[in-house]
Amino acid sequence: MQIGIPTETVVGESRVAATPETVKKLISAGHNVVIERGAGVKAAYIDSAYEQVGAKITDDAYTGSQLILKVRAPKGEEIQKLAANTTIVAMFDPYRNTELDQFASQNVSAFALELLPRTLSRAQNMDVLSSQANLAGYKSVLLAAAEYQRMFPMLMTAAGTVKP
């Protein structure tokens, strides 16, 4: 199966659907992986890192791919690039996304990651809501610390503890 990882087009989105480490696992499982040129740059993954693990860099990750992995749902003309019988996995915001009917009319299967069960099960390690909320919370503390003009009282991190 060919798995395509296109560049994210949502303004401000700096994530990429797969890291070189993840791509290596997909290739080891027997899949072909194509990465759209520059797809990982905003997430600090250069094209050569993907090439080193066996991925092919392309100008169009949609062509020939049976499975598309994205962080955010495709919009507008991106949807038109999806061939019939393609499967796409992304965060779709399904309760507010007005373009979902287009996937069905093109015979495209869409899996909304944010609707995966959030229970103690095998799917828990794929729970994007908890993992992304955890990262957002961590980042918010770092941003607040950068803006705060004094030392935080008792800062505990993986690198150690700074007492007041």
Please provide the spans of the model-predicted regions:
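Glycine/serine-rich phosphate-binding loop and adjoining beta1-alpha1 elements at the start
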Residues: 2, 76-164
